Amino acid sequence: MTKLSKRQQQILDFIKKEVKTKGYPPSVREIGEAVGLASSSTVHGHLARLESKGYIRRDPTKPRAIEILDADFSASNQTDDVISVPIIGKVTAGQPITAIENIEDYFPLPKRLVSSEDHVFMLEVMGDSMIEAGILDGDYVIVRQQQSADNGDIVVAMTEDNEATVKRFFKEKDHIRLQPENSNLEPIIVRDCTILGKVIGVYRVIH
């Protein structure tokens, strides 16, 4: 392989470190911060040169998709058994708040827990309306994107007021009931709502 400049070596080393410790590569912004480059275009330029020299391969449709081709980097560190799941802005599980539909970060999950055919995202929960289902304030729910739900499913739903909430879904005669799992709270009754996905798991940090 063609010899790298000092800066290119710094960037490659940082990408390797992030893949080893987190299971997925860093963003362009994170690379810039790590090596002291304020311009994202400069970082992109260095990545392009690393790619042209055969050290990495990128997927232009995915901002963090960087595969390390360096022969010295063990294949075991490529974490083929891990999938990077996007973390979307917070959604409430108490009083609904307007959904923030932007990716804040990525989180590595074992592929055995998430089918590669599923489109999955994670959301941080705020509030205590789902505590009796074991979903607590500050938890991250793992959500499979889908537009329909069966009665009793725990879903992320967007109401007619364009607010998102985590609730148990029930379609009844002339309305939809979004039922909290907290006996102190009343259900949300709406004529219609948009299902953003079904909750298939919960991730919690124990302090």
UniProtKB/Swiss-Prot annotation:
Record-level Gene Ontology MF annotations? DNA binding; serine-type endopeptidase activity
Q: Which Gene3D superfamilies match?
A: Umud Fragment, subunit A, Winged helix-like DNA-binding domain superfamily/Winged helix DNA-binding domain
Question: What reactions does this protein catalyze?
Answer: Hydrolysis of Ala-|-Gly bond in repressor LexA
Stored SUPFAM superfamilies: LexA/Signal peptidase, Winged helix' DNA-binding domain
Catalytic residues in the record = S129 (for autocatalytic cleavage activity), K167 (for autocatalytic cleavage activity)
Q: Does the keyword Ligase apply?
A: no
Cysteines joined through disulfide linkages: none
Instruction: Give the superkingdom in one word.
Output: Bacteria
Give site residues, Cleavage.
A93, G94
**Any one Gene Ontology BP term:** DNA repair
Could you tell me which InterPro entries the record lists for this protein?
ArsR-like_HTH, LexA, LexA-like, LexA/Signal_pep-like_sf, LexA_DNA-bd_dom, LexA_repressor, Peptidase_S24_LexA, Peptidase_S24_S26A/B/C
Q: What class of enzyme is it?
A: hydrolase
DNA-binding segment(s): 28-48
Known EC number: 3.4.21.88
> Entry's Pfam families?
LexA_DNA_bind, Peptidase_S24
Query: What does the subunit comment say?
Result: Homodimer.
The family annotation for this protein states:
Belongs to the peptidase S24 family.
**In its UniProt entry, what is this protein called?**
LexA repressor
